[in-house]
Amino acid sequence: MGEVRTEVNLTNAIDQGLVRRGQLAPDQVRRYKADALVDTGAVRMVVPPHVVQALGLAITGERLAEYADGRKDIVGMTEPIDIVIQGRSTFDEALVLGDEVIVGQTVLEKLDLWVDCNSRRLIPNPAHPDQPVSKVK
């Protein structure tokens, strides 16, 4: 089994809100496109510092991150990011570390996407191929 990567479009969610309120021109919204690693072992989304800077995101807090090798580190947490993968959109904060964008479990669950290990790609949940479904019970 090899790694799974996907195109992800990230947008500053605060910028989007300012556009909706007429306080920012649409062409001023900060966006970033990445070839992201999909990691089902990562719970949260991860963005590196250069992406935080490109999107103009504020660091709103800190979280304790535990790496696969057992090391732990305090890392920054961003304000909300609009995340679009395969036309499906959600909002989430991200941990700030490393040098590449990583899509973790929470984003996959919110977007109702599955990892197809055989073909090394993301696929929509076969039960909900047209749009994500969020369980509320």
Label every model-predicted segment:
Residues 1-137:
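Pepsin/retropepsin-fold aspartyl endopeptidases
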